[in-house]
Amino acid sequence: MELFNSLIHDTLDLLDAGRPKVWPYRPGMEWTDLGQSELVLQKDAAYELGASGKGSANYVLFTSSAELVNQDQILLYGPDLDEIHGDVDFARIVLLRVGVLDDDTEKVYRILKDIEFAKYHVYPEGYMVRMSPENHREQVRVSRQAIRRGASFRSIGASYIKAYKKDPNVLQATVIFLTAPGFDYAAMKNIAKKSSAVTNTLTHILEGLSTDCSICSLKDVCDEIEGMKELHFGVGAKGAKKD
């Protein structure tokens, strides 16, 4: 699974100038999970991460490369939850190392979507997440009570890692939080769009998208993402053999 590798490199380049706090993941360090969404009223909130008017990005990238993702860990670029005193820019980026999934395109697509949906099943207490998949944004309202009780990106990140690793295809997970000003959140949002385009292209390939590049509406994605064109023609060849 190398389709997202170039996007991982682009992400790491954007983060290169920062000095993150790093926490290795260990089972048991997760924040309290309520098992369902919690409504945090504005009057009970300390602030919002990625609030309207602030930079925000959210995406998940996959790889089978141990060089790109080599351990379960949480990274934080910027102040932690108890150090924030007002609305701030925010990004949550997840890098997942998965097993080799290149044998069956349809199976690969289903596995990736199942893994990605894990993010919708994490319900940290006092940490109300609102996602906008169309805009690739994530906005979080954090309660004052959660901060008093010790909520942190270390424990929130651990909750996400636990959720992702319930899937046996996930070998290692890195969860990255950004709250510092000065990062190019617009560029991160653009990477999120490209990641979504890769997944959407997989869908179209499975639906029998034309292998004539001159008329294909997704030519730009295949040209930019290494391995996509080979995957596309490989599926087309399999379909031709079946016929």
Regions found by a protein language model. Give the residues of each.
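HhH-family (HhH-GPD) DNA N-glycosylase catalytic core used in base-excision repair
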Residues: 1-46, 52, 57-61, 72, ...
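Long, charged N-terminal interaction/targeting segments
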Residues: 30, 35-174
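Cysteine-cluster motifs in flexible loop/terminal segments that predominantly coordinate metals
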Residues: 191-234
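Long, compositionally biased low-complexity segments enriched in polar/charged residues
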Residues: 3-24, 116, 127, 146-185, ...
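Detector for methionine-enriched segments
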Residues: 1, 29, 128-131, 188, ...
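N-terminal cysteine/histidine-rich coordination modules
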Residues: 217-218, 238-243
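Extended non-catalytic scaffold regions that mediate assembly and binding
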Residues: 25-35, 39, 109-112, 140, ...
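Surface-exposed beta-strand edges and their flanking turn/coil or helix-capping segments
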Residues: 75-77, 228-231, 237-240
